[in-house]
């Protein structure tokens, strides 16, 4: 550290030698503070005051913190000021050890501090923006941003809901125009106007009555005073004479005012009567139009009700005549097909069982024939023992032989009884009366279930079978019957009217 007298001496010498400097002061150009890597390396001046040099060039020693992304610390406020000395004074350099480039270093330090402050401000703004977005009131929470993110369908739906009241009003106005209620609305407005007119006319009548009464009172008062003056005519004073003259002159004016008030009263009464008559006429016209409109709406509703009832009856008849039989026929047909399929399966199974039984009998007969050949002696003794054997046994032997011959042919049976083919001996090549009779019976068997089901349905409709119904079902049946009867009667009445 330099001593206080040395600093004073340096400052004094600098003030004396400022005028003798012939060398221009050369300063290093200032560079933008983009970071510690872009700055020039600070030259090492005379190491008289390294602490001051460190304070002035503090930005060069904060590269680690800038690399880590943290803002560099600002220089302390209690740092000692840098003494700027001229570069051309050789005596000052010899005495105190120069700091020739102190002003450029100070400028660079100022630029670095400004850049650090700007970086801090930018980081603070980014943090505030991120916090605002996180909380929901930043750019993502603004109404304009939310409005942009809305879909087209949502916007259209909101517009429709906003204009719902106006649309309903317009629809009601159109409906009134179609039904003729707009004229009734105009009559209502006219009635309100007539009521206001009648109210004003009555107020005018009241005012005219008050004015007429005031005019009558004024004239009667003046006439009374004139009569009093005439009674004491012999004792008139000049004042009484002037008063009598004034009253006599004003009597004509009072008479004219009375007549005018009377005419105004009669005119106001006439106008009030006319307004009342017009109002009553408008009210009667409105009631008449409303009655006509209500009759028209009632007639339209009646025809609409009849139309709906006719549509319901028509649908009922269509379902009962066309749909229900078709559905029932379809169900019966499906049931018949299933029954026929089951019968065919049973027949195939019976045939397979018969064939298997015949095979078993053939096998048993073959075993018995082998046993008979093995013991011929026993057979001969049996023949001698029974010489008078019946010739009916020979066809049995022949059939056994035939069965054995048929059993020698291999037969393959399918695992599915429905797909199993009938044996060859059951196939008939020529139609016989028995086969025709069976075919006819089979066709009649297919038709008979349908007829039987229809017969049972009709018998069930008119049978004495007890049925438990709920009140709802009973009411539905009654309403349907009433609707059908009303529809039939309405159709008959329309036909009769047309004729």
Curated annotation (Swiss-Prot):
Q: Where in the cell is it found?
A: Mitochondrion inner membrane
Ordered alphabetically, the record's keywords are: Coiled coil, Membrane, Mitochondrion, Mitochondrion inner membrane, Transit peptide, Transmembrane, Transmembrane helix
A GO CC term attached to the entry? mitochondrial inner membrane
Q: Give coiled-coil spans as residue ranges.
A: 181-283
What the entry lists under Pfam families is as follows: She9_MDM33
The similarity comment for this entry is:
Belongs to the SHE9 family.
The protein's name is: Sensitive to high expression protein 9 homolog, mitochondrial
* Gene of this entry: she9
């Amino acid at each position: 550290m330099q001593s206080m007298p040395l600093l004073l001496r340096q400052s004094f010498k600098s003030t004396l030698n400022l005028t003798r400097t012939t060398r221009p002061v050369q300063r290093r150009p200032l560079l933008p503070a983009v970071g510690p890597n872009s700055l020039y390396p600070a030259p090492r001046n005379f190491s008289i005051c390294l602490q001051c040099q460190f304070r002035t060039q503090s930005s060069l020693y904060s590269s680690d913190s800038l690399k880590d992304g943290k803002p560099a610390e600002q220089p302390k406020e209690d740092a000692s000021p840098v003494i700027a000395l001229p570069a051309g004074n050789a005596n000052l350099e010899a005495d105190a050890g120069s700091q020739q480039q102190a002003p450029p270093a100070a400028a660079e330090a100022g630029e670095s501090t400004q850049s650090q402050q700007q970086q801090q401000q930018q980081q603070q703004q980014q943090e505030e923006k991120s916090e605002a977005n996180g909380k929901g009131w930043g750019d993502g929470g603004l109404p304009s941003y939310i409005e942009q993110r809305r879909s087209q369908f949502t916007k259209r739906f909101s517009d429709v809901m906003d204009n719902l009241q106006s649309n309903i009003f317009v629809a009601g106005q159109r409906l009134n125009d179609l039904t003729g209620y707009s004229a009734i609305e105009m009559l209502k407005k006219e009635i309100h106007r007539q009521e206001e007119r009648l109210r004003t006319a009555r107020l005018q009548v009241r005012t005219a009555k008050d004015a007429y009464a005031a005019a009558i009172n004024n004239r009667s008062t003046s006439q009374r005073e004139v009569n009093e003056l005439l009674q004491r005519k012999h004792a008139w004073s000049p004042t009484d004479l002037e008063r009598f003259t004034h009253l006599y002159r004003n009597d004509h004016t009072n008479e004219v005012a009375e007549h005018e008030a009377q005419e105004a009263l009669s005119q106001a009464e006439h106008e009030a009567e006319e307004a009342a008559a017009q109002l009553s006429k408008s009210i009667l016209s409105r009631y008449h139009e409303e009655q006509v409109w209500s009759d028209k709406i009632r007639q339209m509703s009646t025809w609409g009700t009849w139309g709906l009832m006719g549509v319901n009856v028509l649908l009922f008849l269509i379902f009962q005549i066309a749909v229900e039989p078709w559905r029932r026929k379809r169900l019966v047909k499906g049931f018949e097909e299933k029954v026929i399929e089951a019968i065919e399966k049973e027949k195939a199974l019976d045939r397979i069982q018969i064939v298997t039984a015949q095979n078993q009998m053939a096998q048993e007969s073959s075993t018995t024939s082998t046993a008979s050949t093995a013991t011929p002696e026993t057979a001969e003794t049996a023949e001698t023992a029974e010489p008078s054997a019946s010739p009916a046994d020979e066809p049995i032997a022949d059939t056994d032989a035939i069965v054995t011959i048929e059993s020698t042919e291999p037969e393959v049976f399918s695992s599915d009884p429905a797909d199993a083919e009938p044996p060859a001996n059951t196939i008939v090549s020529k139609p016989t009366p028995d086969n025709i009779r069976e075919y006819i019976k089979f066709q009649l068997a297919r038709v008979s279930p349908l007829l039987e089901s229809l017969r049972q349905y009709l018998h069930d409709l008119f049978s004495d079978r007890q049925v438990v119904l709920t009140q709802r079902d009973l009411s539905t049946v009654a309403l349907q019957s009433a609707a059908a009867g009303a529809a039939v009667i309405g159709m008959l009445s329309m036909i009769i009217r047309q004729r």
